[in-house]
């Protein structure tokens, strides 16, 4: 690596470190760590196991933030010392480049940690896909998005599970609900909340005309045991029905599918993928809890954007992102203006650039 490039990277890292320091209250962080450590030494600390686990997790996260920042400062000092030696001893070049690479890796990870610092960012996620305007074409578009998000989740190491699948009339889907289990699943996937627009030559049109279709994506955090949502049994109406897999496969001869209606709000959720009625009811209850909690948060104006974003009509002019297959190829996010020409890569689950741009756009 050329020495001028090395100097530029070191200068850029110095500025980035200063920016990190500006966003952190190191003294306050030290005080919070000390308070939690003292709390964990109290004799009755583990009497409430759920609260204790939450405190322990919070302490580990604070310590990780604090220690990682100081690790970056140490590495920055080391590379600046090595740069001084480089003028007299070229043998330190490889060590300097290796230290720079390690620092870049830590900084990238640390920056993502700062971007994912909002409530519920660390939770698992529930993602729903609802085709809108466009009929069969839109339902096929929904199926394409299902494939895209499944591939993204698998690439991230998330456990991706189908909670409910409603096949389209001729092709694609009428709706699908997915769960993503893994670190920061909601924090990453919340960027996908909104209307997604497709422009292509429709394979369902014998005249080979260009069609525009829309599909809505909703994302909610899956609630853990530290967040309680009270649901009275009297407020729930449960219906059961025969369920099957994607495309109508493995249709059950007994009514294992479960549909729950929350009478006071009219919210309806359903699960069809488990082989037992009990399993589907448990999944549906988790979905209902997430929806009720999100609805309650939406009543607080300050939290609307942080949990759900703007809910728009599934039609022209409301899209957050456009996927153009013809007459040129492009995927563009209309919130951040981030765009790429490799539409096939995006459809294969390469969403990192869009998600990173969205997270930076939110905090700016």
Swiss-Prot record:
InterPro entries: PCRF (IPR005139), Pep_chain_release_fac_I (IPR000352), Pep_chain_release_fac_I_sf (IPR045853), PrfB (IPR004374)
Family, similarity comment: Belongs to the prokaryotic/mitochondrial release factor family.
Source organism: Streptococcus pneumoniae serotype 4 (strain ATCC BAA-334 / TIGR4)
Function: Peptide chain release factor 2 directs the termination of translation in response to the peptide chain termination codons UGA and UAA.
Sites of N5-methylglutamine modification: 249
Post-translational modification: Methylated by PrmC. Methylation increases the termination efficiency of RF2.
NCBIfam families: prfB
Subcellular location: Cytoplasm
Chief subcellular location: cytoplasm
Name recorded for this polypeptide: Peptide chain release factor 2
Gene3D superfamilies, A to Z: 3.30.160.20, 3.30.70.1660, Release factor
GO molecular function, one term: translation release factor activity, codon specific
GO cellular component, one term: cytoplasm
Keyword Cytoplasm: yes
UniProt cross-references to HAMAP family, sorted A to Z: Rel_fac_2 (MF_00094)
Top-level division of the source organism's lineage: Bacteria
């Amino acid at each position: 690596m050329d020495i001028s490039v090395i100097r530029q990277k070191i200068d850029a890292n110095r500025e980035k470190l200063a920016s990190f320091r500006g966003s952190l209250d190191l003294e306050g962080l030290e005080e919070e760590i000390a308070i939690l450590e003292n709390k964990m030494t109290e004799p009755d600390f583990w009497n409430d196991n759920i609260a204790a686990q939450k405190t322990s997790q919070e302490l580990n996260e604070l310590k990780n933030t604090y220690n990682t920042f100081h690790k970056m400062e140490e590495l920055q000092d080391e590379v600046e010392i090595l740069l001084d030696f480089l003028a007299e001893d070229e043998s330190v070049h490889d060590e300097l480049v290796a230290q720079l690479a390690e620092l870049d890796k830590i900084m990238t990870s640390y920056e993502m940690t700062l971007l994912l610092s909002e409530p519920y960012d660390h939770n698992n996620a529930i993602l729903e896909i609802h085709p809108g305007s466009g009929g069969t074409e839109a339902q096929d578009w929904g199926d394409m998005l299902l494939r895209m998000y499944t591939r993204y989740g698998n690439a991230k190491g998330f456990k991706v599970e189908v909670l409910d699948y409603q096949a389209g009339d001729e092709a694609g889907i009428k709706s699908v609900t997915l769960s993503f289990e893994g670190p920061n699943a909601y924090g990453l996937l919340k960027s996908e909340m909104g209307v997604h627009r497709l422009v292509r030559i429709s394979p369902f049109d014998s005249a080979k005309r260009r069609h525009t279709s829309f599909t809505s994506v909703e994302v909610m955090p899956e609630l853990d045991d530290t967040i309680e949502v009270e649901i009275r049994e009297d407020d729930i109406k449960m219906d059961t029905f025969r369920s099957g897999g994607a495309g109508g496969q493995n249709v059950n001869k007994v009514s294992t599918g479960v549909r729950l209606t929350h009478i006071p709000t009219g919210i309806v959720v359903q699960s069809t993928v488990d082989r037992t009625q009990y399993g589907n009811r448990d999944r549906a209850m988790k979905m209902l809890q997430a929806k009720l909690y999100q609805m309650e948060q939406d009543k607080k104006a300050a939290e609307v954007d942080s949990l759900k974003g703007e809910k728009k009509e599934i039609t022209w002019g409301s899209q957050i992102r456009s996927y153009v297959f013809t007459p040129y190829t492009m995927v563009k996010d209309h919130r951040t203006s981030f765009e790429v020409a490799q539409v096939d890569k995006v459809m294969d689950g390469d969403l990192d650039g869009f998600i990173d741009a969205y997270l930076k756009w939110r905090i700016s």
